[in-house]
Structure formats: structure tokens, C-alpha cells
Design a protein with these regions (language model features):
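N-terminal amphipathic/hydrophobic targeting modules at extreme N-termini
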Residues: 4-5, 14
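Short, positively charged and aromatic/hydrophobic N-terminal segments
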Residues: 9-11
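Residue-identity detector for glycine
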Residues: 18, 36-37
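Bacterial N-terminal signal peptides that target proteins for export
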Residues: 22-35
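Cleavable N-terminal signal peptides
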Residues: 35-36, 46
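A general "mature secreted/periplasmic domain" signal
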Residues: 49-182, 187-196, 200-266, 270-294
Length: 295
């Protein structure tokens, strides 16, 4: 797992910006906050990676909501495992990596990431393009307190498999925002590997959680976050991401593929204020990005 913090962003054209958002929390987010906020359950002080967590926190409510009574398997790490630090020095930017083994590559169609004890426990839903040989997905999250971080994968044959990791943290969802997230919203950076098998995509955005305080006014900062990112490669779906406030500011996703990632790669993104952003990367040799958001 090696997510680099974006040092600079590419100026990108905002395609569409909606009207000012009401200070109220959108209904889907409000539902998630109520699920997480109603819980006052403690987690034992055990932080082994890929352990089976107890049925505590939001998971006991989320499991039947998303999966009903479907059987949920506990695969070993040769199929999938979750990598996260047992104790994070920065709870507002905790690295998480989802690793998929050879048996899983090309056979997982969706992964839902859940942080049990976050106020918004559903971190992201990741839909992998059909046939895409994705072997790893890395990103950074906010962690509000000691919790299980879960990845629930649905395979192409309809099976559900889960792995998890323990993380000790405190206050990630209310940590003060950094100035780096308050620049030109929607600026995009692509960072490819030399061999073309991995690509990091970053969007400049504050991703306000709704639990942060404006240091100048003392008022709560309303939630404002990237809600959807769609990546296509060579005109085919690569990864579709639905996300919320548990993703760290300046949302960054790194994709590792078992094969070189075809170009061009296009990102279409939108946020909770209905702003839309688009940018395209045309290949490793093409390093510069024009002001219109096309690489």
C-alpha cells in the first residue's frame, strides 16, 4: 500500500455547478448518520489484521439492510484481505488497501467498505468493471474511534465474502480541515506507475464531513463531499465509486491491475452540491494536463 499525498493538482474545468446547498444533511447521508450515531458500543482492544470482528457497531444493522439473509463467507487472505494500520497517527487520513488474490482477480464485481463505528459507516461502494483485472485498491479514510474496517465483496457468481482489519483511532471525522482541500475544487491529478499497471487518481476537494468546526467562526461546516467517481479505461468501465464523508479530503484512489491499464483513462466525478468534474489521462508519456481538464 503506497498512496502518495498529491503535491499538486491539475486545473480542471467544472462542467456544472448546482445552486447553493441547503444546510440540511441529504436524506441518504442523514440515514447513515443516524445508524452510526445511535450506537454506543465499545470494541475490544484487539487489533489483528484480518480478524473476524464481533457483531457490534453499525454492521449488525447494515448487514440485513444490504444483504438480507444471504450467506456471508469468511475467505482467507489468499482471496482478499484488508490492510490498515493497527493504530493510525492521522485518523483523518488513514490508509486502507484492499488486496485481491489471483483467485479473486476478475471475479469480484463489487466491494462495499464499512467502518463500523463511524457516524457514516458506509465508506464507499466500489463497482469493478466486468473483466477488469484489478488486484488492489488503495484509499484514505476518516476513522472516528476504535473500529473494524470491513470489505464485503460480491463475486460474479453471486457469492458474498468478507474480510476485516482493526484500527485504533480517535476523532477522524471531526478533525479540522487542511488548507490543501480548500483550493480549486475539482482539480484532478493522475499519477501512473512507470510500467502502467497502477494509477493513482486524486480530486482536490475538502470533503467536509459535517462534524468539523470552522476555526474562524466556530460554526459547524456543512457536509460537502465527493459522492460519485467513475473511471473508464479505453472506453470501458474500470471502477465506479459511490462515496461519502468517511473518505478523507482530497479523495485519492490508487488502482493496481494485473495488466497494464489501457488508455485513455477518463474520470467523471460529482459532489453533494451537484458540481461535476471531468478529466482524461492519455498515457504515461503524456505528463501535462491542459486547463480544460484533458490530459
Amino acid at each position: 500500500m503506497d498512496i502518495e499525498r498529491p503535491a499538486a493538482y491539475v486545473r480542471n474545468r467544472a462542467l456544472k455547478t448546482g445552486s447553493s446547498m441547503s444546510r440540511s444533511i441529504p436524506i441518504p447521508l442523514r440515514t447513515r448518520l443516524l445508524v452510526g450515531g445511535s450506537l454506543a458500543l465499545a470494541i475490544a482492544n484487539a487489533f489483528a489484521v484480518d480478524a473476524t470482528p464481533p457483531s457490534v457497531g453499525a454492521w449488525q444493522f447494515l448487514r440485513p439492510h444490504f444483504y438480507g439473509d444471504r450467506e456471508l463467507g469468511e475467505v482467507d487472505e489468499s482471496f482478499m484481505h484488508v490492510e490498515a494500520p493497527g493504530s493510525t497517527p492521522d485518523p483523518a487520513a488513514t490508509p486502507v488497501a484492499l488486496h485481491f488474490g489471483k483467485e479473486a482477480v476478475g471475479k469480484i464485481k463489487q466491494v462495499r467498505v464499512v467502518i463500523d463505528n463511524n457516524p457514516s459507516p458506509v465508506v464507499a461502494t466500489l463497482d469493478i468493471g466486468a473483466g477488469q483485472p484489478i488486484a488492489e485498491i488503495d484509499f484514505r479514510v476518516r476513522v472516528d474511534r476504535a473500529t473494524a474496517v470491513r470489505a464485503i465483496a460480491e463475486t460474479t457468481d453471486g457469492k458474498l465474502e468478507m474480510r476485516s482489519a482493526w484500527v485504533r483511532a480517535e476523532g477522524g471525522c471531526s478533525s479540522p480541515p487542511n488548507a490543501s482541500g480548500e483550493g480549486k475544487i475539482g482539480d484532478v491529478r493522475f499519477r501512473p506507475s512507470e510500467d502502467g499497471t497502477s494509477l493513482q487518481v486524486s480530486v482536490r476537494h475538502p470533503n467536509y464531513s459535517g462534524f468539523q468546526i470552522d476555526p474562524k467562526t466556530g460554526d459547524a461546516i456543512p457536509p460537502h463531499y465527493v459522492s460519485h467517481m467513475q473511471l473508464t479505461t479505453g472506453g470501458k468501465p474500470l471502477l465506479d465509486i459511490e462515496s461519502g464523508i468517511s473518505i478523507s479530503e482530497n479523495p485519492t484512489f490508487r488502482i493496481v491491475s494485473a495488466q497494464p491499464i489501457a488508455t485513455p483513462v477518463t474520470l467523471e466525478a460529482s459532489d453533494s452540491k451537484d458540481a461535476h468534474f471531468s478529466a482524461t489521462w492519455n498515457g504515461a508519456a503524456d505528463r501535462a494536463v491542459a486547463a480544460n481538464g484533458t490530459r
